[in-house]
Amino acid sequence: MKVLLINGSPHEKGCTYTALHEMEKVFRESGVETELVSVGTNPIRGCIACGGCRKKGACVFSDLVNEIAPKFEACDGLVVGSPVYYASANATLVALLDRLFYSTPFDKTMKVGASVVSARRGGLSATFDELNKYFTISGMPVASGQYWNSIHGNNADEAQQDLEGLQIMRTLARNMSFLMKSIQLGKESFGLPEKEPRVGTNFIR
């Protein structure tokens, strides 16, 4: 069983990393393998709606998105962490997630998702809601904890002082581990839920 964690901060070892690393420790204690990928300062462009991924099975731009895609397919759970910029996620991370979720043809049903956000002060819940949209449109159950998954601090040292925030991360990791293991047992016993043929409609005809 494996969890992929994406650090969407340009700072490799900052506040977002502090939150994700706290989760990593609990995952490992629970027997769950982890891999942490840092977006860092990689120049990741947004989707240009070319449709090339529908023919190729991968994004036409060969960058970190296509490196992460097979890791995403192989994992049982995905944790996405972001700093808060203007009550929103880091734009580089959003570009990565837009292309990652749209270009990958594999079924994401019942992979467990969780989002983690860090800020000096405000904008956390708006960013948290934004990131969860990627999971809820993809048939991915969303793991929750004892509070919204956030940590406060202006740097990693301050984030380490947010004792409640760190506890939230540990609780989230325990709940996510339980949910992934429960889903695995369910898949072994019952299989995945039946899917109807997809129906698409537009508001304007």
Predicted regions and their residues:
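Glycine-rich phosphate/pyrophosphate-binding loop and the adjoining helix
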Residues: P141-R205
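Cysteine-cluster motifs in flexible loop/terminal segments that predominantly coordinate metals
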Residues: N42-F72, V199-R205
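A short beta-strand-loop structural module common to alpha/beta enzyme folds
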Residues: V32-N42
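Generic secondary-structure signature for well-ordered alpha-helical cores
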Residues: K25-V32, G77, F101-P105, K133-M140, ...
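N-terminal beta1-alpha1 ligand-phosphate binding loop
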Residues: K2-S30
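Helix-loop-strand module that forms the ligand-binding subsite of alpha/beta enzymes
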Residues: G57-Y147
